Amino acid sequence: DEYMSIYGVNTWAMSTYESRRGLARNYITPIIGDMLLSDITPRMMDKYYRDLLSVKTVSVNNRKPTSEYLTPHTVREIHKLLRSAFNQAVRWELISRNPVLNATLPKEEHKERDIWTAETLSKAMEVCDDPILSLALNLAFSCSLRIGEMLGLTWDCIDIAPQSIENGSAYIFVNKELQRVTRGALDDLSDK
């Protein structure tokens, strides 16, 4: 809790804070949260990471989990959070070494993402009869915008005037992003 309230609040973006807070609340605090820092060893962390693979996934914000049990990817995200927390504990001189640095992590299968071809995009544009969705598809693919960036766009960030297009100076400037976060994360980061 101290790590999150001192380090996390001042360092992380809102969505990162919320994600890491959820990992801590659901998978770290209930399992190893009562242990003394000095009692945590690399061997114990190896067992903890192995055992996490048989922990049921917690549903967050009424979203259905994508798998029944924690995946190796989620265990690696938990490891990244713990590595950062223990590094901070070393800097704060609470412990002399980071017990997760040499821990063994589960292997993660890397899957290639399916990427739409020009033909798939063309077909999607043909069948799309909603002008706003059509605009969103065009923006997403022509400007490589993520959904949060698209939803954060305002007219003051866009110059598509005919003369700008003619002279090659048309632009879309992304300086805002819409993020889905909980009320708790908003409250914790209200001073940011």
Describe the predicted segments one by one:
Residues V58-P72, R76-I78, R91, I95-W155, ...:
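Basic, Lys/Arg- and aromatic-enriched nucleic-acid-binding interface segment
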Residues R50, L105-E108, N175-E177:
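Generic beta-structure capping elements
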Residues K123-V127, P131, A161, G168-K192:
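Basic, alpha-helical nucleic-acid-contacting "clamp/cap" segments
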Residues L37, V100-A103, K192:
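Short clusters of hydrophobic/aromatic residues that line enzyme substrate/ligand-binding pockets
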Residues M4-L94, H110:
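N-terminal core-binding DNA-recognition domain of tyrosine site-specific recombinases/integrases
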